[in-house]
């Protein structure tokens, strides 16, 4: 009889522990959802909710080989659109800007944490071998390019970087409160490093610094800033024309 009571007690305790674990999981998931909802990053611009996640997750062993002591934060991995000069379009229309982005190339920036610093993996899809490249590449190099075409690969590993872009955006969530989408773009005239663009359903509203130095932003008086590191789309557009020719 004592044994039976003891067993029932064990079962009851296990059930309690299961319930507690379930509650912790539910609150963690709910907390993550609220955390993600605080900034308007679309599912297609977050790695773990994108169509690229399955393939890129297979690179984890390679990442750990390059940075064995790193804690990789896939939850904060974001898409950066490249080869898309939004400034040259000379428009603030959200539909026109997003249409240009949809046809642009992009990379994924995956942050990681070391003991005392941050780092980033840049993951890009291999491009087809171009005819003009054949004259400057060896046969072996040409074969390597062909083998990587269409496949995701780590193209850069950087240490001692700025904090994760996601964290920077989270710090600027009040400035993004009127925006319905924020995207990261690179190689803009006067803003070569990645920068964030906040848009509402109708128009582009703000540019947000991601911790780099941008010649365009350095020319804007502090009195015209929305807040530190946040600039109106118009104020950047007014002086960015001088950088368009240099970017071509």
Regions found by a protein language model. Name each.
Residues 11-21:
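Bacterial N-terminal signal peptides that target proteins for export
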Residues 20-30:
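Bacterial N-terminal signal peptides
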Residues 30-40:
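Sec-dependent signal peptide cleavage junction
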Residues 38-93:
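Terminal domain-start segments
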Residues 1-12:
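Short, Lys/Arg-enriched N-terminal segments with co-localized hydrophobic residues
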């Amino acid at each position: 009889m004592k044994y039976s009571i003891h067993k029932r007690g064990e079962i009851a305790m296990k059930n309690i522990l299961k319930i507690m674990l379930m509650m912790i999981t539910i609150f963690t998931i709910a907390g993550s959802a609220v955390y993600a909802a605080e900034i308007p990053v679309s599912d297609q611009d977050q790695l773990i909710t994108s169509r690229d996640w399955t393939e890129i997750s297979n690179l984890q062993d390679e990442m750990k080989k390059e940075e064995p002591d790193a804690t990789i934060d896939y939850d904060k991995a974001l898409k950066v659109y490249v080869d898309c000069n939004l400034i040259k379009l000379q428009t603030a229309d959200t539909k026109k800007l997003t249409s240009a982005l949809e046809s642009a190339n992009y990379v994924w920036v995956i942050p990681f944490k070391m003991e005392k610093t941050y780092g980033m993996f840049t993951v890009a899809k291999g491009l087809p071998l171009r005819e003009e490249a054949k004259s400057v590449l060896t046969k072996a190099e040409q074969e390597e390019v062909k083998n990587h075409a269409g496949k995701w690969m780590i193209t850069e590993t950087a240490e001692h970087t700025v904090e994760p872009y996601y964290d920077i955006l989270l710090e600027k969530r009040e400035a993004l409160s009127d925006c319905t989408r924020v995207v990261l773009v690179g190689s803009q005239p006067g803003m070569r490093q990645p920068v964030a663009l906040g848009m509402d359903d109708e128009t582009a509203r703000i540019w947000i610094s991601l911790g780099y130095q941008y010649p365009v932003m350095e020319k804007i008086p502090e009195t015209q800033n929305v807040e530190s590191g946040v600039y109106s789309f118009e104020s950047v557009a007014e002086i960015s024309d001088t950088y368009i020719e240099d970017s071509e």
